[in-house]
Amino acid sequence: MTVRTRFAPSPTGLLHIGNARAALFNFLYARHHGGKFLLRIEDTDRERSTQQAVDVLFDGLAWMGITPDEEPVFQSTRQARHAEIAHHLLAQGLAYRCYCTPEELQQMRDQAAAEGRPPRYNGYWRDRDPSEAPAGAPYTVRIRAPREGETVIHDLVQGDVRVANAELDDMIILRGDGTPVYQLAVVVDDHDMDITHVIRGDDHLTNTFRQAMIYRAMGWDLPAFAHLPLIHGPDGAKLSKRHGAQSVVEFREMGYLPEALNNYLLRLGWGHGDAEILSRDEQIQLFDLDGVGRSASRMDYVKLQHLNGVWLRQADDARLTDDIVARLADRPDVSVDEAVRARILALMPGLKERAKTLVDLADSAAFLGRHVPLAFDAKAEKLLTPEARAMLGELARDLAVIEPFDAPAIDVALRRFAEHHGHKLGQVAQPLRAAMTGGATSPGIDATLAALGRDEVMARIGAVAR
């Protein structure tokens, strides 16, 4: 058997991290077993499903490196097939026409509630002759639910889950306007796409009993089901905006790398020993459903940020530079040309050591593209005393003649200058850093000066020296 999994989102908004994790697990499971990962867009809600939302979805998955092995399937193009199955069940006597009006259905619900029963359809038209219906009356199509025994789902995460068939009602599979309901469309699509494993959030678990009715009525084999626990906020409550970012787009804009988000989402509810940092190849090699827990996971934004810092330090300097240049291009106080790009690239090994996100990285690199005179923050102003400014004027004469103007030579010159004037190295480096950056922090001062280049260093010292 070739494993075939699918991710089947409704394009009605941003790609939520819960859905992103489901997509990741489906992708990794298929890759681990040498199978295929498919994408189905459940866009039957035409009012809420927009092309913009579809584009955002595709972009988010591509950014995460989750790519389908076949062309995406759009559920809205398959409604004729869904209706065909409904009419087949009708012809086989496994479904029937229901002529109840909305008012009659509401009366059934009200009566059931008054009697302490679940408010659902009572099967009024299940065994009645359709000739009893008023001529031309609209109808829905309902499947005949089993009334005896129980339905058992052998879930690969949750274990055996069962429900008494008496608790299942004759659900609608075709609406009065002839359009299929979600439960029918999902089953038909999964069957036709040869899906072997349905891996999704456990908020779909109760749907599985209803979908199993359709599979069995059609005589189709059920796929294996695996229902993943949901992601909660740090406080254990349902993840919401008050907790922080919820969508892939938000995390991307906040400066998270796709490798870090993938790594974090994988470890959120799945375990394999003590391994925390896993490459994509390692994820594919190790991932299987037996490592998925049953309990809801809690989002830990601090841990995600830590992981992102680890992945930043491992990332290619040129790739990070491209991202930072793009982020700085929108800042009015920063100019980014090829010379500034070269400075950022040269200093990237030091810049990324302190950063937790790409936003941090852009903030720390911004001084490389600012023009003289720089604006100084409070810490820099405190460092740039009249005495420090005079000292920098003297230092400039030494820096002007360094050859080559690189980090090792600069380090030697700074140490020699400090020793000659009876200063500790920090007493020289800190005011110099303030003059170069407008702040009090940067990578090593020797590397910072080398990245700026002699002309820019002299210009920045000249703007503050007395």
Curated annotation (Swiss-Prot):
'KMSKS' region, short sequence motif: residues: 238-242
Database matches in CDD domains: GluRS_core
EC number: 6.1.1.17
Transmembrane segments: none
Record InterPro entries: aa-tRNA-synth_I_cd-bd, aa-tRNA-synth_I_codon-bd_sub2, aa-tRNA-synth_I_CS, aa_tRNA-synth_I_cd-bd_sf, Glu-tRNA-ligase_bac/mito, Glu/Gln-tRNA-synth, Glu/Gln-tRNA-synth_Ib_cat-dom, GluQ/Sye
Top-level taxonomic group: Bacteria
Catalytic activity: tRNA(Glu) + L-glutamate + ATP = L-glutamyl-tRNA(Glu) + AMP + diphosphate
Oxidoreductase is among the record's keywords: no
Purpose of the protein: Catalyzes the attachment of glutamate to tRNA(Glu) in a two-step reaction: glutamate is first activated by ATP to form Glu-AMP and then transferred to the acceptor end of tRNA(Glu).
Record protein name field: Glutamate--tRNA ligase 1
Organism, scientific name: Gluconacetobacter diazotrophicus (strain ATCC 49037 / DSM 5601 / CCUG 37298 / CIP 103539 / LMG 7603 / PAl5)
Gene encoding the protein: gltX1
